[in-house]
Amino acid sequence: MKLIKGILFSFFVFSLSSASWARQALTYDIYRLAVQSESRLERDIKRDETRHPREVLAFFEVEQGQRVLDLFSGGGYYSELLSYVVGGKGEVIAHNNQAYLPFAKEDLDERSYAVRLPNVTPLLSEANDLELAADSFDRIFYILGFHDIYYRDETWPEIDDNKLVANLFRSLKPGGIVAIIDHDAVVGAGKETAQEFHRLSSEHVINKMTQAGFVLNDSADLLKNEADPLTISVFDKAIRGKTSRYMLKFIKPLAN
């Protein structure tokens, strides 16, 4: 009898493990299908080599049916990938402000959300004017833009960092994830690197996010580039498109 119980227990554990593995494999396959979609733009595919989108989507646990905010989405590289993953029952809000549009125009014209990606809703708003419903997003992607909070220029409206991050916290569902990727700077460097190099040390992001109530759940070195000196502009020809970038996964704690 003990032998039979042992066999049954082992089979039960094996079945659970197999089911868990199968779910993980199926989920990861969703990311592969998104990246390999024949509908993707050629300009996006050329960027994949240094961006590793399949691994990024997996790291931030994007799933079917989710509602995702792509904050300062630019030309929409991630908005399109997210739209494939969340599917018809999900939605992607592709946000930009007015200053982004001239730089993203060529990409956005070809992206043609209304025709190609009906589950993507463009949102044009300055950061300080964002109106986001409470607990309305499962994921928030903030890719290569956090440093712009501390950038100052006559063509770039000043951003209230506390107001923006508090807005993100309020609009994210409990248990939801904020995905942040940005150009790294030298450890200990001040926020002035955002102005000078369009970079920001991860410590500033972590401090600002945790002060607002987020919890840093994980980080990854997937996009790290040891050849990046971290002390030149991200637009320098020597490093453009190949900067060393950090990946930070923040979670909004579940309500008590």
Task: Show the residue positions of the predicted features.
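Glycine-rich SAM-binding Motif I of class I
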Residues: 76-80
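Core SAM-dependent methyltransferase catalytic element
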Residues: 212, 227-256
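Short glycine-dipeptide loop
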Residues: 65, 88-90, 172-178
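A short acidic, Gly/Pro-enriched loop at the edge of an enzyme's catalytic core
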Residues: 130-140, 144
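A short glycine-rich, Lys/Arg-flanked "PGG" loop and its adjoining helix->strand segment in the class I
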Residues: 83-84, 155-174
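Class I SAM-dependent methyltransferase Rossmann-like catalytic core
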Residues: 30-59, 63
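Conserved class I S-adenosyl-L-methionine
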Residues: 65-74
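S-adenosyl-L-methionine
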Residues: 104-130
